[in-house]
């Protein structure tokens, strides 16, 4: 059914007086009609099931993560920026699980982007989607988290090598193509940093090597995004992609310039290996502010759209999570 026909169907089913009969049939009809015309109900009815599914799984992982943080006492023990760093796994995991849901609701579309030379496209679409959802719950519950983080780092690195770089190579002048490449690279760096921080004692060399690789995987995208946001402040900030910042966003271009400045300072510190924990935390905070003041309003306005609503909200929150995952893996004192 189309959105309009779904709404008509809803009113036909729930707008009958006999469903709302109390002591007065007409009064029941008025109550039901008012309910059917309420903004919340109308928004739910006209929102496609694909969008609802992604938001549901996203919210479920978010809720589990929040409960875990507070029940384990992590929030009470953390101080200063460490309180923000606590949310790194949560901010990464919730969008990841939401994107995993799309592999089940948009299977054919997801399968179509798998390289032609790889067999069983539908299988990989389902398999990766299931893994993303499972990994999301793993990150927030800390069950087999090192395994999940390691596999996520490998998965996103393979995405970069097998899909993103070949696409960008067809048109190297496409700055958005490079933006996608570096975004996926950072999505590999975050969980790689987490896995490195969980390396068993006695393997300090391996831990330092992987943590350094993860730092570069995040620092390079942060610096490139800083440059892009200075040049194209009229485009959406955080992860600077093609859409222009909507006119209804309060402050408009100021969010791009704010993020660009913080990214520039934080990115340089991450690249040279100085004050890395604080640098990553401050970059993460700037992304979170962009998420709250830019992408949450966009998601509300575009609540019926995956492409223009949930996906941009999720991408930016996941980027925030990946930077905070890096922060959590960096030394406390330098």
Where are these regions (language model features)?
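Conformational-control "hinges and anchors"
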Residues: 136, 267
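Residue-level detector of alpha-helix boundary/anchor positions
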Residues: 12-18, 175, 307
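Short hydrophobic transmembrane-like helices used for membrane targeting/insertion
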Residues: 1, 13, 30-32
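Short, Lys/Arg-enriched N-terminal segments with co-localized hydrophobic residues
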Residues: 22-30
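Membrane-interface interhelical connector segments
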Residues: 105-117, 230-252
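Short hydrophobic targeting helices and cationic amphipathic motifs
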Residues: 4, 10-11, 19, 23
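Extended, low-polarity transmembrane helix blocks
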Residues: 31-105, 124-131, 141-234, 250-265, ...
């Amino acid at each position: 059914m189309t959105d309009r026909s779904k709404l008509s169907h809803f009113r036909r089913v729930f707008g009958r007086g006999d469903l709302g009969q109390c002591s007065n049939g007409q009064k029941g009809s008025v109550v039901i009609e008012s309910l059917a015309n309420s903004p919340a109900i109308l928004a739910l009815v006209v929102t496609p099931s694909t969008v609802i599914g992604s938001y549901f799984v996203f919210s479920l992982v978010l809720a589990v993560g929040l409960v875990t943080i507070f029940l384990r006492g992590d929030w009470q023990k953390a101080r200063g920026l460490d309180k923000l760093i606590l949310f790194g796994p949560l901010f990464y995991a919730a969008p990841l699980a939401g994107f995993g849901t799309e592999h089940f609701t948009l299977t054919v579309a997801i399968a179509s982007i798998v390289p032609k030379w790889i067999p069983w496209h539908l299988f990989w679409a389902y398999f990766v989607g299931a893994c993303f959802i499972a990994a999301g719950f793993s990150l927030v519950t800390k069950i087999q988290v090192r395994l999940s983080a390691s596999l996520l780092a490998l998965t996103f690195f393979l995405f970069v090598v097998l899909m993103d770089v070949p696409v960008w190579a067809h048109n190297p002048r496409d700055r958005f193509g490079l933006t996608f490449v570096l975004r996926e690279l950072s999505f590999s760096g975050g969980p790689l940093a987490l896995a490195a921080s969980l390396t068993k004692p006695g393997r300090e060399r391996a831990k330092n090597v992987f943590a350094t690789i993860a730092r570069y995987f995040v620092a390079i995208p942060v610096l490139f995004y800083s440059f892009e946001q200075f040049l194209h402040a009229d485009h959406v900030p955080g992860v600077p992609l093609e859409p222009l910042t909507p006119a209804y966003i309060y402050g408009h271009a100021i969010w791009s310039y704010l993020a660009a400045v913080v990214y520039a300072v934080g990115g340089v510190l991450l690249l040279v290996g100085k004050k890395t924990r604080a640098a990553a935390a401050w970059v993460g905070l700037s992304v979170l502010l962009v998420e709250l003041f830019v992408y949450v309003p966009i998601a509300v306005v575009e609540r019926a759209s995956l492409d223009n609503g949930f996906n941009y909200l999720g991408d930016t929150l996941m980027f925030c999570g990946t930077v905070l995952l890096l922060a959590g893996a960096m030394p406390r004192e330098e």
